[in-house]
Amino acid sequence: ALTLGAGQAQAATTWKIQSVWDAGTVGYDLFEEWCNSIKEKSGGELIFRPYPAKAVAADNNALFDAVRNGVLQGMNPFTLYWSGKIPASVFLSSYPAGPDQPHQWDTMFYSLGMLEKTREIYKKYGLFYVGPIQHDANIIHSKKPVNSLADLKGMKIRVPGGMVAEVFQQFGVSTVSLPGSDIFPALEKGTIDAADYVGPAVNYELGFSQVTDYILFGPPGVMSIYQPVDLMDLTVNLRAWNALDPKLQQLVEEEVRNYSQKHYLTIQKRNIEAMEKFKADGDTVTRLSQQDLQEFRRAAIPIWYNWANKNEDAKAIFDMQLEYMMNDTVGYVTEEDLKAAGK
């Protein structure tokens, strides 16, 4: 990593950065530790002052505006939160049956030009997208076993809205939108059959093993077929970024990549431990097959296009991803798939 020496004595630049993690969570602890390391790594020239969720900006809308307006210099959100503000952001984190491995997202951002395109889009909003932060997959906990897509028919499932809900509806699911805090009571009362939330570690802490008996995964190696790589990021105020010395800009970019890896690997270790606890509590993992995933993807393709066609920036990002998915190194989408979808 690039560490800067304390050269000429100059006043340190201090950035206030708010995360969407609540204080006391592993996510916030990791974020705080990383922020606190920047002063030393920058030779005292740059200080990141971390804040947990709601500390300065009370909700996501306020957070977005606080960074645009310079009340905060930066934020650490889930990228998907901005789908209503930056339409392209629906393609800046995973979506149903799209690229489903973390390394594929790093490849698209850092090797195939997606980072540059994303920054170009964010600049229109007075923001600078520093880089993606790998996090985890989102998974479904169910009161009933789901051994195939056919088993979804007639189920009432809490899922995020938008593209995810639209694809599940193709398989006869009645989708419900609920805030995280309402999921446990809804499962407990049986008003829903199943619920998506984040990964195993967090879901275990929320008590999901007490109110469900099954965990739905994709084929081996794919924890989730609908939101497998739920990315976070570091986004900063564009003026604050431009005012930073180029060598400090380089440090921040490198440090975001380091932090992405540390955050991801820590969460994965917690997931492995949590799955053992789910098993001990009597939960069973059911897996969809590779054929199920292909069928899910075929249903998703027209929905991808609908979302991409809402906005030219969204389409530019999606076109990059489609080209990558059609490359033989990935092979997720073929010309035949597109023809079948009428594309």
Q: Where do the PLM segments sit?
A:
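N-terminal secretory/targeting leader peptides
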Residues: Q10-Q104, E120-K343
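C-terminal segment of classical bacterial N-terminal signal peptides
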Residues: L2-A9
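Signature of the catalytic double-stranded beta-helix
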Residues: Q104-K117
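Short, flexible coil/linker elements and helix-boundary hinge sites characteristic
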Residues: G5, G113, G342-K343
